[in-house]
Amino acid sequence: MEEEVAALVIDNGSGMCKAGFAGDDAPRAVFPSIVGRPRHHGIMIGMGQKDSYVGDEAQSKRGILTLRYPIEHGVVTNWDDMEKIWHHTFYNELRVAPEEHPVLLTEAPINPKSNREKMTQIVFETFNAPAFYVSIQAVLSLYASGRTTGIVLDSGDGVTHVVPIYEGFSLPHAIARVDMAGRDLTDYLMKILAERGYTFSTTAEREIVRDIKEKLCYVALDFEQEIQTASQSSSLEKSYELPDGQVITIGNERFRAPEALFQPSVLGLESGGIHVTTFNSIMKCDVDVRKDLYGNIVMSGGTTMYPGISDRMQKEITALAPSSMKVKIIAPPERKYSVWIGGSILASLSTFQQMWISKQEYDESGPSIVHRKCF
């Protein structure tokens, strides 16, 4: 028996790409899903200027580049750039030959059919992988929490999904998608900091605001109460040092920004908050499975990392649910990477090995095989 070849697991998010080997407990590579191209061509001849940069390198050279995110709201919109990101993942980050490893990719729930086919085609035709599988992100997060039934609230940088899952299958009619996630909260924080007199406008400055958000923001258990506390004392204020050494102070912005998750109306959005969306999704499911869903509400993705979010969610859902219902929020500490971790678990299961689409099957049936083998 030759040595088992590890499968490659790649979770392509709107904001960050997480990649690594099946069986590992964390991704080896985490980098921004960005492709940057020089704004001006060939000013410095012989400077070895590349025509495109990916990930951290694009981020560090952002001053001279135009940055683009090929994944918007969880769905791939630019395939040329997406191919560059995968190329970078295989050859520069993981340093592997894709033609030697099975590849597991993740996709957003309710991803258009044509997108899955295009993904399949690129993996087999451009990268010559021996085998391929595509899995729904929320389902992988649920596996990572050790469950096969539950409702997943997956909120990343570009999109938020609520996905009820029963015995390993998502229930498509009850899936909800909200185009509000980390990127929108960063924008909102930029806006309310501007009202305090701190203006951040360029794409480079936006990254600073994202850092402020990740380090200092939290979700209030009682928003009105917290606003009152903040106005009466400086106990909630925190200071932050900007890259140039200037120190700024932020107060109620710390909890006003993430409050948009529960009150999207502050962003001018019509959708209900994440608690209402979750409740509505449960109500669209069969009455017999609701108890299992209320008792297994699983948080996943970077935008669920705010301190206080679980307690607030518990409070809000309990208020909406039938009075005797047991509501349980599961927020694993590693939830930022739980989609990837679920993929790592799935791809290393012995029972999963017959699930892969092989190169041979692809050659015989073409890209549409993905709909028959991956669900």
Swiss-Prot record:
* GO CC annotation terms, alphabetical: cytoplasm; cytoskeleton
Q: Which reaction does it catalyse?
A: ATP + H2O = ADP + phosphate + H(+)
What protein is this chain from? Actin
PROSITE patterns in the record, alphabetically? ACTINS_1 (PS00406), ACTINS_2 (PS00432), ACTINS_ACT_LIKE (PS01132)
Which taxonomic lineage does the organism of this UniProt entry have?
Eukaryota, Fungi, Dikarya, Ascomycota, Pezizomycotina
Which InterPro entries does this entry report, sorted A to Z? Actin (IPR004000), Actin/actin-like_CS (IPR020902), Actin_CS (IPR004001), ATPase_NBD (IPR043129)
Keyword set, alphabetical order:
ATP-binding, Cytoplasm, Cytoskeleton, Hydrolase, Nucleotide-binding
EC? 3.6.4.-
Per the record, the similarity remark reads:
Belongs to the actin family.
Q: Could you tell me where this protein is found in the cell?
A: Cytoplasm, Cytoskeleton
